[in-house]
């Protein structure tokens, strides 16, 4: 089990290359076509092509700088009131202090299932919990679920998942979904294949109380089905249709043995 905690997410460079290629190749080809069809000096034609390449670099950087905002908008979250959700805020503060990371902002979705996720672009992070998690879980269960969120932030998984999913989301659904198989493979390449197990074990190391997370995951399983295809990998308990390597029953069995 120790090995699941040692391996982290892979390099994000292929994600940026994929996005730049998917956006830039059509732009560069269009620029070349314009340079060929419209009579112009060679230098001007080269400038058109260089301009297309520069636009590609700008669009790639702009997308990266806003991936956290893009995903929070996609999830349709609202700020969690610090009075109504004082318990969650207090738990996040304590768990963050224990793990050595800055406490994330807390957001809420109106979904009545039990689930949570972490969003992080580079610095500040965000924790998102469902209304179901806020209302259905007792303190120990919520602590276990939030501990997994903090563990993903501390271990780098939150940033890797945020950037990979946020950058490649345009190619997993909608008019560009013909690129979905390649985009999905790229996301899976970046994310640690043991991420669910390593997250569970890191969360338990934070709380020192495996039943809390176990019971939260059991309730999440009963409420499974949250989220869209594009955000499935972000959740602590991914929808059953996602490409999660480990079935939830395996995760629960390991927690029962812990």
Give residue ranges: language-model regions:
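Residue-level signature of catalytic and energy-coupling elements of molecular machines
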Residues: 68, 92, 129, 148, ...
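Hydrophobic or amphipathic, alpha-helical segments that drive membrane association/targeting
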Residues: 1-113, 171-172, 177, 181-190, ...
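Cytosolic juxtamembrane N-terminal segments of multi-pass membrane proteins
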Residues: 1-10, 127, 146, 153
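Short pre-active-site segment immediately N-terminal to the catalytic Zn-binding motif
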Residues: 130-144, 193
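Short, Lys/Arg-rich cytosolic juxtamembrane segment immediately N-terminal
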Residues: 6-14, 156-161, 229
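Active-site-proximal gating segments in proteases and membrane effectors
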Residues: 98-124, 184-189, 203-258
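Active-site His/Glu-centered metal-binding helix of metallohydrolases
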Residues: 146-154, 198, 202
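Catalytic Zn2+-binding segment of zinc metalloproteases
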Residues: 150-166, 210-211
